[in-house]
């Protein structure tokens, strides 16, 4: 639902160019919150739509939103010092887990896994994932889509060499699936529902039991180190937590707002909510989330998706627990 209202997250606004990083480095030092601008990464129809609706937009600091097409791009922007805070799944930080990374995970969002699916065309003869051996399967690189596909392959004792894996953006994947260029598509969010509605796609598998459903709130380490910016991040996270709670009790209102922001029909959002595996909540860093992301990293390393094993534990920052409890 909310995490993938974004998932027209395929729409990347040009507001944050990584070539302008030097000019985007946050200022530090004395001052007041009213003089501070918190740089927040979001998706189309995301936090910039939700917080005002939930009555959480009256911040004592300014907020500059930049829309991104995916959590992998938000991860890159944080590491480029272009963003102070943003959200993504537990997958992108694995690819950024290196000693000099600037990304820190400050909270855990528990979300839906039923909107992460393997789709096949309506006339496909496939009845189980094993039937897709040798077939053209679309996925989104460095996202839950790639990890989900790897898990499905491992269940059948297959590897990426046993399929024709096609890395595509969600936008390109939807178009390719619609014109019959894919035999299956491993995808998430609004696009998965759109493919079912527009093209009659059939769900072959869901991610229930295969993905954790953990998403992450992450921040720039430089911003955390600055007292004023840290204060703004803590306040903003609390507002996001309350806004998620509002969306749970106002599903019809949220569906209308998300639809207006993204152009996807209201019915798509209501259908997503009806089919989801659980509510969306934001809470503090938790041991199970730390363990889960390390397991993702270990799985990717063993499969050769990343070049070497990585320790993801240094990415976690538990100092915002009070703001999220």
What are these regions, as identified by a protein language model?
Residues 1-19:
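N-terminal secretory signal peptides and thylakoid transit peptides that target proteins
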Residues 22-23:
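C-terminal motif of bacterial Sec signal peptides marking the signal peptidase cleavage site
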Residues 31-159, 164-167, 183-187, 209-211:
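Short, glycine-/small- and polar/acidic-enriched structural segments
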Residues 76, 80, 94, 130, ...:
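Solvent-exposed, polar/charged alpha-helical surfaces in well-ordered, non-transmembrane soluble domains
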Residues 91, 171-260:
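Pocket-lining segment of extracytoplasmic ligand-binding domains
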Residues 101, 158, 264, 305-306:
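Helix N-cap/coil-helix junction residues
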Residues 227-305:
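Secondary-structure end/capping motifs
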Residues 297-325:
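Conserved C-terminal helix/tail region of periplasmic/extracytoplasmic solute-binding proteins
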